[in-house]
């Protein structure tokens, strides 16, 4: 039986990055580092997240800094930032799912239809303010938004289809001879080489179309803000005289302006609610994602291969002070399911789960990841099912499991 003393959840560094402690825990985790994200997530992943990073993470950062230092220590802040980033990624995926896209198109199409109908019905009205031009511009914005959404939706579907076809190579159903299997592998390799140029050209076209669509959507968003101010000024300047001379155009403009305000307030309130939930009720957020999201992380088999420990809390008489770590020993975590279990001594400040912020109770089952960080089994298992990375240092557990399989 071997015994080790851990110096903290935040001080354990993954084996792959032991040469630099700053790679495991960023001293300024709230500042965006584009190089790290590109290295961990591929070429375009960092750019995509850098645009969306301002939403939920701002609320999580504010609430984390506003909390006390005991409740929200640095490891807990890192875990909640990782959860907020995961929510942002899934929010983007959900925003371009088929039901949401259909609802968005139907909603904007209804605005265009109503605006067109009112403009036709009120052709005899003569408003003192150019609200006809404003309604026409509003309808054109809705049309441009629908076009951008359709282009982005098709691009994401095409990329998802290409990813599925490239990650699932053909397998032979029978292994009657080694020559037949090798010929199948050569044919599969040749087909992948032949389709490589086509995939590259399609990817280049997708990138260009996506860039144009994003620029149009950004310009449309900026123009809609300016257009809203212009419409509000014209409606306010017209007053009762405008309402009496052109009631249809006047009230339709009021409705459109009111809907825009409602959507802005709703989005801001939703971001604040999600930020509060990420900081205060992170296990609930993980449970919801675990229930509704598809498996994109580790499988149950990969999770079960991780080392499981059982925490044993020491009594007051058995607790002692560690001079090197300058802390009091809280308990011992013992490896489960082995004849020669490994034991880790946990200090008082490290005997808590960074996900749920609850202290380890006597007999609690813990899961230790390859990077050395440990959490409640019930907390981290659901997280790994959604995302196969450590919630604290973002170490990918599938890398270590694949290496172990190759060694075997």
Curated annotation (Swiss-Prot):
Signal peptide (UniProt feature, chain positions): none
Pathway entry: Protein modification; protein ubiquitination
EC number: 2.3.2.27
Low complexity compositional bias, start-end: 10-34, 163-183
Catalyzed reactions: S-ubiquitinyl-[E2 ubiquitin-conjugating enzyme]-L-cysteine + [acceptor protein]-L-lysine = [E2 ubiquitin-conjugating enzyme]-L-cysteine + N(6)-ubiquitinyl-[acceptor protein]-L-lysine
GO biological process: protein ubiquitination
Coiled coil: none
Keywords carried by this UniProt record: Membrane, Metal-binding, Transferase, Transmembrane, Transmembrane helix, Ubl conjugation pathway, Zinc, Zinc-finger
Localisation: Membrane
SMART domains, per database record: RING
Gene Ontology CC: one annotated term: membrane
Record function comment: Mediates E2-dependent protein ubiquitination in vitro.
Protein name in UniProt: E3 ubiquitin-protein ligase At1g12760
């Amino acid at each position: 039986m071997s015994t080790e003393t851990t110096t903290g959840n935040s001080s354990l560094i993954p084996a792959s990055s032991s040469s630099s402690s700053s790679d495991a825990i960023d001293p300024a985790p709230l500042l965006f580092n584009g190089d790290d994200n590109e290295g961990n997530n591929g070429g375009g992943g960092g750019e995509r997240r850098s645009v969306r990073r301002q939403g939920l993470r701002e609320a999580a950062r504010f609430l984390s800094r506003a909390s006390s230092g005991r409740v929200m220590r640095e490891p807990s802040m890192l875990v909640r930032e990782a959860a907020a980033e995961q929510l942002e990624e899934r929010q983007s995926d959900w925003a371009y799912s088929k039901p949401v896209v259909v609802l968005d198109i139907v909603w904007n199409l209804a605005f265009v239809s109503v605006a067109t109908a009112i403009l036709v019905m009120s052709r005899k009205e003569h408003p003192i303010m150019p609200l006809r031009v404003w309604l026409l511009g509003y309808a054109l914005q809705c049309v441009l938004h629908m076009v951008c959404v359709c282009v982005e939706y098709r691009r994401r579907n095409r990329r998802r289809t290409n990813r599925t076809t490239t990650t699932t190579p053909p397998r032979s159903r029978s292994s009657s001879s080694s020559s037949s299997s090798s010929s199948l592998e050569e044919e599969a390799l040749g087909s992948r080489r032949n389709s490589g140029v086509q995939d590259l050209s399609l990817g280049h076209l997708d990138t260009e179309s996506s860039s144009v669509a994003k620029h149009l959507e950004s310009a449309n968003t900026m123009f809609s803000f300016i257009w809203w101010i212009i419409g509000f000024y014209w409606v306010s300047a017209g007053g009762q005289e405008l309402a009496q001379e052109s009631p249809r155009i006047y009230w339709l403009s009021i409705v459109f302006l009111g809907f825009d305000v409602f959507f802005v307030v709703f989005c801001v309130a939703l971001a604040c609610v999600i930020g509060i939930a990420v900081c205060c009720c992170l296990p609930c957020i993980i449970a919801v994602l675990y229930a509704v999201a598809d498996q994109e992380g580790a499988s149950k088999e990969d999770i079960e291969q991780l080392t499981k420990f059982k925490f044993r809390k020491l009594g007051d008489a058995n607790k002692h002070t560690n001079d090197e770590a300058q802390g009091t020993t809280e308990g011992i975590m013992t490896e489960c399911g082995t004849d020669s279990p490994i034991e880790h001594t946990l200090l008082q400040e490290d005997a808590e789960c960074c996900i749920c912020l609850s202290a380890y109770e006597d007999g609690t089952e813990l899961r230790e990841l390859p990077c050395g960080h440990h959490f409640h089994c019930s907390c981290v298992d659901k997280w790994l099912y959604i995302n196969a990375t450590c919630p604290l240092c973002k170490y990918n557990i599938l890398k270590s499991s694949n290496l172990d399989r190759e060694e075997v």
